[in-house]
Swiss-Prot record:
Protein's name according to its UniProt entry: tRNA:m(4)X modification enzyme TRM13
ZnF (CHHC U11-48K-type) ranges: 58-85
A GO biological-process term: tRNA methylation
Primary gene name: TRM13
Cited Pfam families: TRM13, zf-TRM13_CCCH, zf-U11-48K
Cellular location(s): Cytoplasm; Nucleus, Nucleolus
Entry GO CC: cytoplasm; nucleolus
Residues the record lists as binding Zn(2+): C61, H67, H77, C81
Protein species of origin: Eremothecium gossypii (strain ATCC 10895 / CBS 109.51 / FGSC 9923 / NRRL Y-1056)
Reaction catalysis annotation: cytidine(4) in tRNA(Pro) + S-adenosyl-L-methionine = 2'-O-methylcytidine(4) in tRNA(Pro) + S-adenosyl-L-homocysteine + H(+); cytidine(4) in tRNA(Gly)(GCC) + S-adenosyl-L-methionine = 2'-O-methylcytidine(4) in tRNA(Gly)(GCC) + S-adenosyl-L-homocysteine + H(+); adenosine(4) in tRNA(His) + S-adenosyl-L-methionine = 2'-O-methyladenosine(4) in tRNA(His) + S-adenosyl-L-homocysteine + H(+)
GO molecular function, one term: tRNA 2'-O-methyltransferase activity
Length: 442
């Protein structure tokens, strides 16, 4: 959208200080004006200059379409674009990154052929009775519901959130599951938590808080765990620096007798890397046990993580706790356990292909989390291509999610681990309420 079409949305107000001029373009989403400086005599910066202003035409940058560049200067811009510099720096770093190997966690299976909407809908209609039959034969027992709460998270985190505690409730339950499953740090048992798809590192931060506070409540001093944070993005407002600050603050509040120079800070390592390319063994400290964690690891990223863990140093892998989400964003070719689905099809629908059935599962899985408008009854069909009422679509969506998740659970069970699917939070807290808990057998 051109700048001229949005200028009218800018709230009226006083004139800008000529000595501190800023671009007059108003950013509705950020509720403020653009912070860039325009050229002398201009109201807008180059990025937001209206297209009819007589200035040179601008086009999206091919490297990063979030910004534009004068068309006449495109060639020179590509050589100095920040994205080019970032890519060059990343390539240079990779030459000295033993934990990077392109595609090391990708599956060898060829990619599934793309299906148009008509083909996909036909596959869904064919898969519905197959899914119902599989569920009746294989998944009759419901998942264990274990909505837990961690006292340390409630003590530190909850007072900071007077209203919306949905994320904190999920973190509290996941952290308590780690504790009760024996996937917990202690002064005599140092561990490293590896958070996949970490984002800002929020889950790891509160694991750190809970572990340190628990040790201090027992008389301290605390021995915080180590953390390895993995994400392919580089989000703003990361929590990395907060880990040490939290340890210092908790010591000051609950164990002030420990001198500041004797308060150990956690080792926090962040790597910007796609899980697909991660060689985990090269990131871990020798002799240190590790535990994988993640909250709402999206779609195919869960399958890449499972293969990453299986290919890593299993002798030091104590276990994993992964809250999964977005089965509709999976990939038949990258799914961790296609043999599991193929075996089910061989028993219940030998004439249906794995690829089409999995694509149908992905489509149906979205029905469980799409939600309803207020007041929509269970019997509402709403012109849906399946002809099924919304309550039945939701039920089938949960069955599709269960099948995808059961294959992941079986993947680790086949490696000799104790693996369990469980409901870790209330549905009104999050519709993505299933976690995979993996433990090394005793």
């Amino acid at each position: 959208m051109e700048a001229s079409s949005l200028v009218a949305e800018r709230p009226t107000g006083g004139e800008q200080d000529p000595g501190h001029a800023r671009c007059a373009f108003y950013l509705p989403r950020k509720r403020r004006s653009c912070g860039m400086a325009p050229k002398a005599g201009a109201r807008f910066c180059a990025e937001h200059q209206p297209g009819d202003s007589g200035t040179a035409a601008r086009v999206p940058c091919p490297l990063d379409p979030r910004h534009t560049v004068a068309k006449a200067q495109l060639r020179s811009h590509l050589a100095r674009c920040n994205r080019t510099k970032q890519d060059q720096a990343l390539r240079a770093e990779r030459e000295h990154m033993p934990w990077y190997e392109a595609g090391v966690n990708s599956a060898a299976r060829p990619a599934a052929a793309a299906a148009d909407e008509a083909t996909l809908q036909a596959a869904v209609m064919r898969a519905i009775p197959v899914l119902a039959q599989i569920a009746e034969a294989e998944f009759r027992a419901p998942l264990r519901v274990a909505v837990l709460s961690n006292a340390q998270v409630e003590h530190v985190r909850f007072p900071q959130l007077p209203s919306n505690r949905k994320h904190a409730l999920q973190q509290s339950s996941l952290i308590q599951h780690l504790r009760e499953a024996g996937l917990w740090v202690a002064p005599e048992r140092p561990v490293a938590y590896v958070e996949f798809g970490c984002g800002r590192g929020e889950l790891s931060r509160y694991i750190n808080q809970a572990a340190v506070l628990e040790q201090l409540e027992r008389g301290g001093p605390a021995a915080p765990p180590a953390f390895v944070l993995v994400d392919r993005a580089c989000p703003r407002m990361k929590f990395d620096s907060k880990f040490a600050e939290d340890v210092a603050e908790l010591h000051a509040r609950f164990c002030p007798s420990v001198p500041p120079d004797e308060r150990p800070a956690p080792a926090v390592t962040r790597k910007k890397i796609d899980i697909r390319d991660l060689r985990l063994a090269a990131l871990l400290s020798p002799g240190l046990e590790h535990i994988a964690v993640s909250k709402h690891l999206c779609g195919v990223a869960t399958d890449l993580t499972l293969r990453c863990l299986a290919a890593g140093p299993r002798a030091s892998l104590c276990g994993a706790l992964i809250a999964m989400c977005c089965r509709h964003a999976c990939n038949p070719a990258e799914y961790a356990n296609p043999a599991y689905v193929e075996a089910l099809l061989a028993r219940h629908a030998p004439d249906m292909s794995y690829d089409l059935f999995f694509l149908a599962l992905m489509k149906m899985a979205s029905w469980a989390v799409s939600g309803r408008r207020p007041g929509v009854p269970d019997t509402e069909v709403g012109g849906h291509f399946s002809g099924l009422a919304i309550a039945e679509r939701e039920r089938l969506g949960h069955l599709a999610r269960r099948l995808v998740d059961e294959g992941r659970r079986q993947y680790f069970a086949d490696l000799g681990y104790d693996a369990e699917l469980l409901v870790y939070c209330e549905r009104d807290t999050s519709r993505e309420d299933i976690a995979l808990l993996v433990r090394r057998p005793a």
